[in-house]
Swiss-Prot record:
Uppermost EC category: ligase
InterPro entries registered for this protein in UniProt: AMP-bd_C, AMP-bd_C_sf, AMP-binding_CS, AMP-dep_synth/lig_dom, ANL_N_sf
Protein source organism: Mus musculus (Mouse)
Assigned keywords, A-Z: ATP-binding, Fatty acid metabolism, Ligase, Lipid metabolism, Lipid transport, Membrane, Mitochondrion, Nucleotide-binding, Transmembrane, Transmembrane helix, Transport
Region called Disordered, residue ranges: 114-144
CDD domains recorded: hsFATP2a_ACSVL_like
UniProt-recorded name of the protein: Long-chain fatty acid transport protein 3
Cellular component GO terms held in the UniProt record: mitochondrial matrix; mitochondrial membrane; mitochondrion
Main location: mitochondrion
Spans through the membrane: 3-23
Length: 667
């Protein structure tokens, strides 16, 4: 009915709209309308769930925080339905509920809770009967850490697996915040993360104990409760969490223990990737966790689907979108601890996978694999994710289709998300007025030289025209908040823009440049810090990379800017990885960039590597590569320089490097 009410006035206005030449956008109206209706239904369903939990008995397991009541509900409604597949292990929703209940009770014991009834009204911090934890607990751990307070933060340093999920869910049920720590961090970065989120405890995988040994004195000095997850835990001051949980009953935990005072309260911390510095602990609210229950619903995924997830759980894409999104629809998730391109299609065939959650690099790894029989006999109908480049998109569909690719855009700490629900290749979303009515955002003009939005005489920002790159911003509101980061308030200063369209308004600054085309499709253009300026022109590193990646002998390309003495701006440099068994063809490469890129956008330097440096989530390391420069006496990789006079890429020898610095070699 809602769809008909929206469609009727548009039909009446159709003749006028055709005269105004808006048909390029109107042709996508059915898809826009269908997604809008789905989004409205999703919002209504999430609101109904939240209201039902709020009205439930505080003693019931179906009250409290959204993770607690959603899992309890699914355990009651579909107890035998498979929730998790991990290797040869299978866990039903009822088993997930019981395992997390044991973990919750182990943590509640560390809080001093003994299972009494609650004392007063909803939202109170009273917990019923609470006493100090048994005296032997702290002594056994060799720590003087006080009992965990309600709302204390417990950091997880765990690989993707069942233990990660049961501990995360158990912490939520126990009324404790969780901090997901990237598993590769050690020494200074690890201690920084623990301090920045105010962690009171750390749960670590036993397999990490050896590499963490140098950090243990500092961890003990911080007064942390220390737990490990395995029978091999025999290090002084570290207890075996799973052993403690095994001693607990698996009965449901009262919901009031996890009920937030406010839905905007911090539920957990997720650390940014740290590509430009130390990671920041993004605050994730209870509202955002609830909203993430709707992710797969918005993507058209259903309860009977089987979702393949091989992304790190310490990032939002794996935990909130993958796991919480799966809980939102009650589906099954196949959790792979580490992505393997050679095993992917065999896994999909074995587990009858229908949905695959990706980041762009995973799809590129798949298309670069040798053909296999399993890739022709699968049931995958939908791939959902972000960061898929157009050339890989086309190759992926041509080789593995028919299936749908649903590209999305979003940020861990952000308040805006986009969905390309039409399948248009290369687009990250739609900017239809229907979509922006539900998920408001704008593209504003941006000066890459000053690093600031362009403002008019009144001091307000201006929206971009079709085809013009613009900074993506979204209004901060009660429905779309920005909570910032744990620690000093100035960490979030650059993420907020004020007086954008009117005095007093506040918008979230994504730091990303997007382009909206004539048909209303959004295309990722560049990160504001990644756009380089050379010869007085702006160069989008992503566009240059996409051009080079069409060469059949290149498997991976990373474009970044380097400072050249005697020149303004930053010159483009391309780190290249070859596609085996191909060889680097400098003549073809120069011809290709000359034909497809303007002179100022052509890379001045090439660096040939066996594989390109990435973060744990496969994001390319641009800052590090830029800092390493192009000095052949420092770098062992083969280097090449563009000689403008000759019109060719030549080996960057020490002699040519000296000629470049003296100005004798023109680039």
């Amino acid at each position: 009915m809602a769809a008909l009410l929206l469609l009727l006035p548009l039909l009446l206005l159709l003749p006028l709209l055709l005269k105004l030449d808006v048909w390029p956008q109107l042709r996508w109206l059915p898809a826009d309308l269908a997604f809008t209706v789905r989004a409205l239904r999703c919002k209504r369903a999430l609101r109904a769930r939240a209201l039902a939990a709020a009205a439930a008995d505080p003693e019931s397991s179906e009250s409290g925080c959204s993770l607690a009541w959603r899992l309890a509900y699914l355990a009651r409604e579909q107890p035998t339905h498979t929730f998790l597949i991990h290797g040869a292990q299978r866990f039903s929703y009822a088993e997930a509920e019981r395992e997390s209940n044991r973990i919750a009770r182990a943590f509640l014991r560390a809080r001093g809770w003994t299972g009494g009834r609650r004392g007063s009204g909803r939202g109170s911090t009273e917990e019923g009967a609470r006493v100090a934890p048994p005296a032997g607990d702290a002594a056994a751990r060799g720590t003087t850490a006080p009992p965990l307070a309600p709302g204390a933060t417990v950091a997880l340093l765990l690989p993707a697996g069942p233990d990660f999920l049961w501990i995360w869910f158990g912490l939520a049920k126990a009324g404790l915040r969780t901090a997901f720590v990237p598993t590769a961090l050690r020494r200074g970065p690890l201690l920084h993360c623990l301090r920045s989120c105010g962690a009171s405890a750390l749960v670590l995988a036993t397999e990490f104990l050896e590499s963490l040994e140098p950090d243990l004195p500092a961890l003990r000095a911080m007064g942390l409760h220390l737990w490990a997850t395995g029978p091999e835990t025999n290090v002084a001051g570290i207890s075996n969490l799973l052993s403690e949980a095994a001693d607990q009953v698996d009965e449901p935990v009262p919901g009031y223990l996890s009920a937030p005072q406010n839905i905007m309260d911090t539920c957990l911390y997720i650390f940014t990737s740290g590509t430009t510095g130390l990671p920041k602990a993004a605050r994730i609210s209870h509202l955002k966790v609830l909203q993430c229950q709707g992710f797969y619903h918005l993507c058209g995924v259903h309860q009977e689907d089987v979702i393949y997830l091989a992304l790190p759980l310490y990032h939002m894409s794996g935990s909130l979108l993958g796991i919480v999104g799966c809980l939102g629809i009650g589906a099954t998730v196949v959790l792979k601890p580490k992505f393997s391109a050679s095993q992917f299609w065999d896994d999909c065939q074995k587990h009858r996978v229908t949905v695959f959650q990706y980041i762009g690099e995973l799809c590129r790894y798949l298309v670069n694999q040798p053909p296999s029989k399993a890739e022709c006999d699968h049931k995958v109908r939908l791939a959902v994710g972000s960061g898929l480049r157009p050339d890989t998109w086309e190759r992926f569909l041509r080789r593995f289709g028919p299936l749908q690719i649903l590209e999305t855009y979003g940020m861990t700490e952000g308040n805006v998300a986009t969905f390309n629900y039409t399948g248009r290749q290369g687009a990250v979303g739609r900017a239809s007025w229907l979509y922006k009515h539900i998920f408001p955002f704008s593209l504003i003009r941006y000066d890459v030289m000053t690093g600031e939005p362009i403002r008019n005489a009144q001091g307000h920002c201006m929206t971009t025209s079709p085809g013009e790159p613009g900074l993506l911003v979204a209004p901060v509101s009660q429905q779309s908040p920005f909570l910032g980061y744990a620690g000093a308030p100035e960490l979030a200063k650059d993420k907020l823009l004020k007086d954008v369209f009117w005095s007093g308004d506040v918008f979230f600054n994504t730091g990303d440049l997007l382009v909206c085309d004539e048909q209303g499709f959004l295309h990722f253009h560049d990160r504001t810090g990644d756009t380089i300026r050379w010869k007085g022109e702006n160069v989008a590193t992503t566009e240059v990379a996409e051009v080079l990646e069409t060469l059949d002998f290149l498997q991976e390309v990373n474009i970044y800017g380097v400072t050249v003495p005697g020149h303004e701006g930053r010159a483009g440099m391309a780190a290249l990885a070859l596609r085996p068994p191909q060889a680097l063809n400098l003549v073809q490469l120069y011809s290709h960039v000359s034909e497809n890129l303007p002179p100022y956008a052509r890379p001045r330097f090439l660096r040939l590597q066996e594989s390109l440096a990435t973060t744990e989530t496969f994001k390319q390391q641009k800052v590090r590569m830029a800092n390493e420069g192009f000095d052949p006496s420092v770098l062992s990789d083969p280097l090449y320089v563009l000689d403008q006079d000759i019109g060719a890429y030549l080996p960057l020898t020490p002699a040519r490097y000296s000629a470049l610095l003296s100005g004798d070699l023109r680039i």
